[in-house]
């Protein structure tokens, strides 16, 4: 039986989030609605999650000493990584020592912190279908890994840093002239300085989806796996622009997608939500990536599901029942900063909300960049295409000024 103490009391149930952006903010809100005391951690002040948590902390989460000192001082019941750039070896050590429970597990946080760990697990350990790939530690290695005459992945292909966020550093290559530029772009977009990339042969897929996969306790107290309806999405430069739910799939493709998602998440273990990214070509499904946390494309669930992805995550990690039922078809569209400024102002909010059956989420980020995600428009409709048009219309009516 799950018990939850009163926040700010000696018996409080305390949860620490490592990473307090827009996704972490929504997880914090979901936890607070269940009476949990929250600690929001990020590398900069006034992050979105800092603005609503009981406690806000600023550290370098890649610094093992700072991370250990904070966790030992705060003594949370659960530590929930919300980003990849964390000293995961420290989390593994603290979990082994019995200091704290990491969500979903410290091993999962380590394996998914970079594209090499999770790709090797999926393709080489679990034998799941993926695009052809190689890992490279220099420009020369990258050129050799692509060269089709030497058994490389050939063109077109995609180059990504081993660790990056929101598509940073990713590029598609159509020929040899693109290689050096792609290497430099990957190095600039990487969150760490290990100078390694993954190059993937291009999969000529029909569409790509995120399959939100939830591991939560069932009625018998054992962990069960359940799935949300498939989420379709469109990306630009590796970054999500819009998403919609449900995305139509054949029964065969859906079964394959669920099999792949179940295989990966069961191996990673623990409880919580996982965003499993998949490419689909006909009935063939290819594994791409997995995040052991809510997914940016899953923000659409804030308008489509009875329990959105953040509520599902909060419930699952606390040992509470979950419900992945779809409430309505819907869509999300990103609101970009469009300006380089701090303390921006949002205009046109009233105009945006006049679009039928729409909602807005403005993230409260303290600084805007041209392509920074500052908010999201949500729309529901029985027809997905109508929802997509309305979400895009609402997002376009919001203006950001410095």
Swiss-Prot record:
Biological role: Involved in the de novo purine biosynthesis. Catalyzes the transfer of formate to 5-phospho-ribosyl-glycinamide (GAR), producing 5-phospho-ribosyl-N-formylglycinamide (FGAR). Formate is provided by PurU via hydrolysis of 10-formyl-tetrahydrofolate.
Species whose genome carries this gene: Mycobacteroides abscessus (strain ATCC 19977 / DSM 44196 / CCUG 20993 / CIP 104536 / JCM 13569 / NCTC 13031 / TMC 1543 / L948) (Mycobacterium abscessus)
Gene designation: purT
Assigned keywords, A-Z: ATP-binding, Ligase, Magnesium, Metal-binding, Nucleotide-binding, Purine biosynthesis
Gene Ontology molecular function, alphabetical: ATP binding; magnesium ion binding; phosphoribosylglycinamide formyltransferase 2 activity; phosphoribosylglycinamide formyltransferase activity
Sites where the protein binds Mg(2+): 277, 289
Domain ATP-grasp: 120-318
Residues annotated as binding N(1)-(5-phospho-beta-D-ribosyl)glycinamide: 22-23, 82, 296, 365, 372-373
GO cellular component, as recorded: cytosol
E.C. code: 6.3.1.21
Residues reported to bind ATP: 115, 160, 165-170, 200-203, 208
Gene3D superfamilies noted in UniProt: 3.40.50.20, ATP-grasp fold, A domain, ATP-grasp fold, B domain
Protein name from the UniProt record: Formate-dependent phosphoribosylglycinamide formyltransferase
Pfam family, one: ATP-grasp
Family: Belongs to the PurK/PurT family.
Pathway: Purine metabolism; IMP biosynthesis via de novo pathway; N(2)-formyl-N(1)-(5-phospho-D-ribosyl)glycinamide from N(1)-(5-phospho-D-ribosyl)glycinamide (formate route): step 1/1
Broad enzyme group: ligase
InterPro entries in UniProt: ATP-grasp, ATP-grasp_carboxylate-amine, ATP_grasp_subdomain_1, PreATP-grasp_dom_sf, PurT, PurT/PurK_preATP-grasp, PurT_C, Rudment_hybrid_motif
Gene Ontology process terms (BP): 'de novo' IMP biosynthetic process
Assembly: Homodimer.
Catalysed reactions listed for this entry: N(1)-(5-phospho-beta-D-ribosyl)glycinamide + formate + ATP = N(2)-formyl-N(1)-(5-phospho-beta-D-ribosyl)glycinamide + ADP + phosphate + H(+)
């Amino acid at each position: 039986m799950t018990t939850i103490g009163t926040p700010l009391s000696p018996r409080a149930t305390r949860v620490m989030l490592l990473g307090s952006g827009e996704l972490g903010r929504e997880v914090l809100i979901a936890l607070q609605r269940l009476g949990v005391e929250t600690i929001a951690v990020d590398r900069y002040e006034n992050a979105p999650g800092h603005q609503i948590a009981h406690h806000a902390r600023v550290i370098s989460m890649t610094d093992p000493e700072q991370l250990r000192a904070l966790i030992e001082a705060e003594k949370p019941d659960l530590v929930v990584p919300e980003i990849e750039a964390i000293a995961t070896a420290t989390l593994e050590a603290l979990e082994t020592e019995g200091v704290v429970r990491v969500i979903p597990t410290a091993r999962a946080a380590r394996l998914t912190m970079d594209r090499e760990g999770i790709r090797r697990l999926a393709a080489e350990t679990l034998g799941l279908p993926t695009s052809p790939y190689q890992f490279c530690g220099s420009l020369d290695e990258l050129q050799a890994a692509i060269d089709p005459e030497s058994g490389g992945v050939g063109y077109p292909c995609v180059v990504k840093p081993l660790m990056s966020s929101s598509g940073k550093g990713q590029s598609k290559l159509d020929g040899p002239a693109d290689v050096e530029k792609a290497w430099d772009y990957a190095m600039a977009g990487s969150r760490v300085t290990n100078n390694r990339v993954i190059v993937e042969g291009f999969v000529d897929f029909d569409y790509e989806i995120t399959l939100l996969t939830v591991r939560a306790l069932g009625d018998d107290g054992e962990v069960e796996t359940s799935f949300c309806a498939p989420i379709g999405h469109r990306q630009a430069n590796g970054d999500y622009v819009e998403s919609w739910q449900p995305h139509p799939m054949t029964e065969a493709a859906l079964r394959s997608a669920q099999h792949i998602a179940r295989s990966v998440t069961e191996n990673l273990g623990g409880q919580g939500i996982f965003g499993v990214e998949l490419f689909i070509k006909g009935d063939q499904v290819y594994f791409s990536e997995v995040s052991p946390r809510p997914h940016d494309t899953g923000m659409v669930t804030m308008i489509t599901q009875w329990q959105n992805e953040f509520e599902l995550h909060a419930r699952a990690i606390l040992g509470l029942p979950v419900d992945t039922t779809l409430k309505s078809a819907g869509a999300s569209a990103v609101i970009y900063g469009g300006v380089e400024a701090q303390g921006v102002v949002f205009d046109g909010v009233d105009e945006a909300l006049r679009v039928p059956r729409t909602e807005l989420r403005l993230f409260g980020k303290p600084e805007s960049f041209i392509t920074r995600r500052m908010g999201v428009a949500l729309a529901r409709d029985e027809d997905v295409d109508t929802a997509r048009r309305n979400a895009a219309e609402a997002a376009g009516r919001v203006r950001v000024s410095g």
